[in-house]
């Protein structure tokens, strides 16, 4: 748990008021770093976490896990245990994720990896991947990270791993 502080968007010493419209919540560390030196307004970022797209199949999912991210089983798994980890906020580009979302996704990836290893001793490796944009193969425009369990001998020659997205480049020459 992190302590929250009330912060003035426009600091009082720069003419900011005590009105509600000029206040935001920041964690104690962020507030201490911001101090009264700038008028950075973080409220829009906080509000953006609630954005959902009514037409997005991932935005419609109600799953536990974390307030910023969650995990689901892939409906078209490459291997048994194939999971998708994604932010709750509707955002299509991996590179547009906010750092707290990346942190939540990373935490869930680690937890799911541990869970899979404890329940299936045949797992000997993982592929972790993101398709960012249609030209990279992204078909659902809501960021999702694939966690794909691998097993010894699940394919003849796995060397090259994710390089296989361009088949002629998978083999190291």
Where do the PLM segments sit?
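Histidine-centered nuclease catalytic patch
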Residues: 1-25
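Short Cys/His-centered divalent metal-binding micro-motifs
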Residues: 23-45
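Short Cys/His-rich "knuckle" micro-motifs
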Residues: 1-9, 35-39, 64-67
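Short cysteine/histidine-rich metal-coordination sites, predominantly Zn2+-binding motifs
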Residues: 8-15, 42-51, 70-71
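HIT superfamily nucleotide-processing domains
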Residues: 47-173
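Short, cysteine/histidine-rich loop/knuckle motifs that typically chelate Zn2+
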Residues: 1, 29, 55-59
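Activation segment
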Residues: 13, 34-36, 95
